[in-house]
Amino acid sequence: MYTGIILAGGKSSRMGEDKSLINSNVNRLAKEMELHGCTRIIVMCGTLERADLFELECVIDSAESLGESIFELVSKIEGRIQLAPCDAYLADSELFERIDGVPVDDKGIRQPLMANFDSKEMVTKSTKISEVFELFPTCDGGLKARNTNTPEEFREIQCFLKQEDL
């Protein structure tokens, strides 16, 4: 089985609005994951109250930290996993196709929340995302691997969204 997990449970405090609802990106990412070959899509929605925001299968965070919640969810799944944060507005099936491990974006930032891996490879349980994915190989993700945390970053991403070929 090939499972896509969309991370959409954050508070989006720096953005000032819920990033998971901008541009219907959770649904868009789900479609891109399906195009890539994911047969099951799960949204890690954070809390029970947020589950109604999404039309897809939702899972509530099971631990205090995202790292531990991801670890616990992945431990219940067999096969390949493709992660994607809800603020990956440029990610598409072409990007997912070339990810093997943890991609590095065009700014040189490692993006562990966009990792692609076999569930058996997740062996480190930690509260820190960087530690959970530290043993995973790094691969090139380029511009499409960027995530967005502030209104300024989103404006920059919007410029790229207006272009046809990334």
Where do the model's predicted regions map?
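Nucleotide and nucleotide-moiety/phosphate-recognizing core
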Residues: M1-R110, E131-K144, F154
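Conserved nucleotide-sugar donor-binding
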Residues: I109-K125, P151
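Conserved alpha/beta core of the MobA/IspD/sugar-nucleotide pyrophosphorylase nucleotidyltransferase superfamily
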Residues: T124-L166
